[in-house]
Amino acid sequence: LDSIPNITAEDIREHWRRTHTAGNLRFVVAGNFVGRIGQLREILNSFELGAGDRLPIAVDEMHSAPAFAIRRKDVPGIGLAISLVVPRKLSDAENEAMSLLNHILNGTLHSRIQGEARRRGLLYYMWSQLSTFEHNSSWDFGAQVSVSNLPAVVDLVTNEMQRVKDGLVDETELAEAKSYAMGRYQMGTQTVGQIAGWLADRYFFDGVIDDFSAVPARINAISPEQIIETARDIIRHNCWTLGLYGSTDKTMADQLYDRFAKLF
């Protein structure tokens, strides 16, 4: 924020020249192009952009951080966030494995964490997801929880992650997660918007055009062992933090941080 007053018009022009080039441009167009391919190419080739280069993605040095709390007295519930980072780009198989694990943990009303937390009246909704970047990947959890239920929710998350770490993923729950993933796959390209979104999700990131027809084989190839080892590797790196948002304080965040630290 302190640097904002120092930005000049020339800084903006230089940024534009460096970033708005054909080499740094990525886009996806989806639809019925029968008889219109030539017109589309003409439009795309009319862009007045220099050749340029694809700009590299910066490498950040990742490390654990202390607990944090963003205090907002006007927010009644508490936003809970937990993030674990591994300093590498996970493979397609590892991404698929973690997607299935996240479904087992938080994907349904019968899932290990969200389902159990709802059954016990601890929260209404909790999510988890795996995000892969060029130089690191993160496994993130989030929920909206009342102050009184925070310790129980963090203990539940910790215990279920420990169970995975201990190798407790069975074929039955994996089969259910695969069935859900196959249904999501079958419904994933019913509109041109979905097709464009599917392709863009990967292509914008690393230039790979994902083979939609190969997805079922990728899903079916995942074993409990693959899930367990991928989760263990993320936990093994011990690079994480926990934070709160709402009408709470740093003391509560520190206490929850210590509870979750038992996983490591």
Which residues does each PLM region occupy?
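His/Glu-based metal-binding/catalytic segments typifying zinc-dependent metallopeptidases
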Residues: G52-S111, G121
